[in-house]
């Protein structure tokens, strides 16, 4: 809806403009292009002045300025990722609060209208809450009369008001559900800060994918900017050959190693996955303690657990992924671009 689109684009624009300030390069502030050009100009001057000591110091100073610039941008991006993470938390708290208020108003409206009264003021209040919610997440509402179960044609004069967010029921008459945020124990990207939140439904523990294509509103924008990788997360397929999945002993413990073929990341300079983290196979998450990139371009991940023979058999040829494909240029994307430049420099 229009409200959701407005919430999405306003929040996205706000944080994109902040990121843009980190890459400013103009007369008021020297940025990447200027610092890089200055460093190479100083290097060229050094070569043409028989490596004069003062000129060499000037080159070293310009190289240090470039390094300081990259460190500063990285720090700013990570701090912004923390700000986004905190806003996700406060936004979820607000969503839960709105759901609670709507459920309470539903009851108040029915208490007034069952006795023949008019609850216009309460209905207006509820409509404002729904408008606020729809700017955060996609909202669907329905209101149907409640009838006598013994006499279906008998209208009781009260209604059941339901609110769904992203297709899932959040308010059901007088009852409501809440979302929970849980800090990740493992990083997805090398440069992620600790404690990024994932969302689940509090009652079922089922994941709530706030960055999915079906989402809208400001909550999606927050996740896009915090986790956006330009749809370039790690993917691949476990090999089908013998030895693609095998158990081994590490530090006295039996664990399983899986070899991933045809990975989406074949250039080590572009590699951004965490040294240890979570790999997803058959919609289940598994912790890995480390990984190696093999000479043939495949990857071998050492899981923190031992898979039984049945599990190993099911894994053969299956797709794997690390993190989600988030089609937005968020913090991970810019951090990855900087790392890629520095590794190839």
Features from the language model and the residues they span:
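Structural signature of extracellular appendage/secretion-system components
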Residues: 1-344
